[in-house]
Amino acid sequence: MANILEPFGIRIDADNSFVQAAVTGFLLVGIASFAAPLISTIRVLLSLFVLPGKSLTTFGPRGTWALITGASDGIGKEFALSLAAKGYNLILVSRTQSKLDSLSADITSKYGPKIAVKTLAMDFALNKDADYNNMKKLIEGLDVSILINNVGLSHSIPVPFTETPKQEMTDIIMINCMATLRVTQLVTPGMVSRKRGLVLTMASFGGFFPTPLLATYSGSKAFLQQWSTALASELEPHGVYVQCVQSHLVTTAMSKIRKTSALVPNPKQFVDATLSKIGRSGGAQGVAFTSTPYWSHGLMHWFLSRFLGERSETVVKVNRGMHENIRRRALRKAERDAKKQ
């Protein structure tokens, strides 16, 4: 039996072909075990820091429309400002009309008639057919080439599932899950008919890494991950690219974090990373149609997934401890505030 490792300067002196094959096999497994993490490290670094994403014009030329849910604050607002700067007309959907009007006025003041803006105020928690019918009428005849599924809701504070208020639980499911499905089902048929389009759904580490005391929110984001990946496979043959965008903390009203850091970007930093890495997996190595585009989030996602496992006991315990601590601090603050009144 030929020694297949001789070209690499490794010679196995064994008359028995079985022994030679076994030793060769063990050596190859050892080499592969060493090479796999090295290759994975190179891939994640290239994806996060070197390789560009797909151009937005791949999915629709400037002058077509982008529909953004949860558009009046935080990440959604930043998507609106960024896409307007790139030449896309906007359909802004959120709960509060006054905030939508203010954002629309800011964009119109900056870009004038070059960027058209339409708004729709609706409360996704109510799941009203009339609201979705209004959305359908609003987008009728428009070339909506980009959909940003951004609207979302978390718990007011970390809470055990058995103590979660029924209304909070229902609102999370309606906003995070049902609203995303219904909006996407309204918008994507037009993309399919035009054979191009982009759907970005904002997910969360809570959907990848089980998060005790945010169980309903964590489950809703896990649902979005599975749904988005399945939808992406369905729509890919029709020229529509669907990507689930993973993130850790961002300075938004939902996170209640105001100060940025290496691990916590502001909305502009996060949106810039997202739009510059479309089609790149970032830290979500090996997860189809998914990206963790912000550099520190990507490195964190990759490290935890590769070396600990998304659903490992260690990750779940650490998550539980962190959110138990957040809950204690939130309850103490509520007590102090109550005494002041």
Swiss-Prot record:
Membrane topology reported for the UniProt record = Single-pass membrane protein
Q: Which GO biological process categories is it annotated with?
A: fatty acid elongation
Q: Name one GO cellular component term.
A: endoplasmic reticulum membrane
Q: What subcellular locations does the record give?
A: Endoplasmic reticulum membrane
Give the matching CDD domains.
Answer: 17beta-HSD1_like_SDR_c
Does the entry feature the keyword Cell wall biogenesis/degradation, yes or no? no
Which residues are catalytic? 217 (proton donor), 221 (lowers pka of active site tyr)
- GO molecular function term, any single one: ketoreductase activity
Segments forming a coiled coil: none
**Keywords of the record:** Endoplasmic reticulum, Fatty acid biosynthesis, Fatty acid metabolism, Lipid biosynthesis, Lipid metabolism, Membrane, NADP, Oxidoreductase, Transmembrane, Transmembrane helix
- Residue ranges spanning the membrane: these are 22-42
Q: Which SUPFAM superfamilies match?
A: NAD(P)-binding Rossmann-fold domains
The cross-references to Pfam families, in alphabetical order and at most eight, read: adh_short (PF00106)
Query: Which pathway does this polypeptide act in?
Result: Lipid metabolism; fatty acid biosynthesis
Instruction: Kindly list the positions annotated as binding NADP(+).
Output: 67, 123, 131, 150, 217, 221, 250, 252
**Function comment:** Component of the microsomal membrane bound fatty acid elongation system, which produces the 26-carbon very long-chain fatty acids (VLCFA) from palmitate. Catalyzes the reduction of the 3-ketoacyl-CoA intermediate that is formed in each cycle of fatty acid elongation. VLCFAs serve as precursors for ceramide and sphingolipids.
Q: Which family does it belong to?
A: Belongs to the short-chain dehydrogenases/reductases (SDR) family.
Q: What is this protein called?
A: Very-long-chain 3-oxoacyl-CoA reductase
